[in-house]
Structures are given as structure tokens and as C-alpha cells.
Amino acid sequence: MEKSIWLLACLAWVLPTGSFVRTKIDTTENLLNTEVHSSPAQRWSMQVPPEVSAEAGDAAVLPCTFTHPHRHYDGPLTAIWRAGEPYAGPQVFRCAAARGSELCQTALSLHGRFRLLGNPRRNDLSLRVERLALADDRRYFCRVEFAGDVHDRYESRHGVRLHVTAAPRIVNISVLPSPAHAFRALCTAEGEPPPALAWSGPALGNSLAAVRSPREGHGHLVTAELPALTHDGRYTCTAANSLGRSEASVYLFRFHGASGASTVALLLGALGFKALLLLGVLAARAARRRPEHLDTPDTPPRSQAQESNYENLSQMNPRSPPATMCSP
């Protein structure tokens, strides 16, 4: 009986102890899980939207914010924006802030159209682009550099795509010669979305007839060709997209000559007329010079000139009275 009581007492002591140990282990595991899933220290990161759209001629804002592991950094920093590709693309904007300053002095602004809107001290590198053009349609990458006690830098890898839209504009329209004395017309336009081109003219009727060239467009440029112009007159190229339309015209007037024999006779007649005209001019000049020679007085002979000289000499020296002779 005493042995049974002793065994029951041992079991009563062991069970609470085991329960306490298990509870302590579970608590420790919960504490470890809380540390793992808690927010880690700040790391480098860049937040940019995938795309920004704006119309040509307007302005666009490229947002860019970042985080970094260096808390309360107030040393010198540089903000940079690149175009085309990260790390190696050409810089379009750069500014630098001195230690403790929130003013980022602009060192580079391509064509004066890029301006920093954000404050790098507050982890904001947002950029404003003025007077957009179709050439600005590309990808841009923001970058920040620390150069104080901490030397560190970070740049966005994917960047933000700037999508520029534009109404169509015809940049060239011309008529070019083709083999076999034929002519063809070319029309080149730009726009985004790429415009659809159509030709209208005497040979195409009154309605617009779309004649798209098999040549592919280059970038935002699209070219349409009218391969054979069979009639003289006005040919109009029309470019249109969702933002508008544009038109330009070119005129074709061909010289319609006669047959071969008539053409030769016409050329010979023109040459003969020019020859007669030249002979008439030469004859008129010769007739004008002839009266001038007849009206010119003859030159007096030399003998008369000498006699008059002697006469003048005798008049200037009259004869003196004869000298008186004295006899011895």
C-alpha cells in the first residue's frame, strides 16, 4: 500500500514538471518566430511606376522614391537620372547636395528641360520633364549616391517608361521619277500611335483610297507610296490617328511634247530664230559705229602748224633799228 502511494506521488510530481517544460519550449519558439517575422532593418530599394504617359508639348513627372540602410544620413549626396539603359545610359539630369543641405544644386539638365521635383534628403528623386517630344519616348532610371562618411549608391534596374503620344504630322511629301518615264509619290508622317496614311488624287477618285507602302515604319515615322501617277493634278496625303489628322498636297504637271519630227523641227526653228536675232544685233552695232567715224574732223597738216609758229615768233621779236656806224 505504501508503495502504491509512493508511485502515485512520483507520477503527480513528474506530470506537472513535464507540462512546465513543454510550455517553456513553446514560449521560446513563439518568441523566435516573432523576431524572424518582424520588420527587418531598412535596405536599398527604388519605387518607380512601370509607365507614365503624356502628350507631346506637355510636361510629365517621373516619380521615384527610395529607401536606404543608413539612418539619419546628412552627408553629401548626388541624384542622377539616366535614359535608355541603367548604369551605362546617358545622363539627362544630375544635381548635388552639400552636407546638411536640402538644396540639390543642378549640375546637368539636358536642353534645360529636366527639373528635380522631389527632395533627396527625404528619399524622393521625382523628376519633371518639360516640352515633351516624341524623341523623349524611352525608359528612364533614377540613381542616388552617398559620398560622405558612408560611400554607397543605388540605381533602379527596371526604370520607368515615358510614353509620349502625339497627333500626326506630315514631315515630307514629294514626287520622284521612276523607270520608264513614270513618277511616284512618297509621303512620310510621324505620330503616336503611328498614323494611318491615305492618298487621294485624280486617278484615285474623290474618296480617300488607302495605299499603304510595304515599307515598314521606323520608330514613330510611317511612309506610304503611290507607285504610279498616271494623271496630272493635285495629289493629297492624309495622316490620321486617335489624336487628330494632318494633310499635305503635291502637284504633278508633265510636259507633253509632239512627235519626234515635230520636236526636231521645233528645235531647229528656235535655233534659227536665235541666230537671226544675233545677226541683227551685230548689224545694228556696226551701223551705229560708222557715222561716228564720218563726223570726226581731219588733223591739220604739220606744215601749216610750222608756218604759224614762225609767224608768232616774228611777231614776238620785231626788227630793231640799224646800228649807227662811227667813222674813225
UniProtKB/Swiss-Prot annotation:
Q: How does it sit in the membrane?
A: Single-pass type I membrane protein
Q: What is its main location?
A: membrane
The question of whether Transport is a record keyword is answered with no
Q: Where is this region: Disordered?
A: 289-328
Question: What SMART domains does this protein map onto?
Answer: IG
Q: List, in alphabetical order, the GO biological process terms annotated in this UniProt record.
A: regulation of actin cytoskeleton organization; regulation of bone resorption; regulation of osteoclast development
Q: Where are the transmembrane segments?
A: 264-284
Indicate what this protein is called per its UniProt record: Sialic acid-binding Ig-like lectin 15
Recorded source organism is Homo sapiens
Q: Which gene is annotated as encoding this protein in its UniProt record? A: SIGLEC15
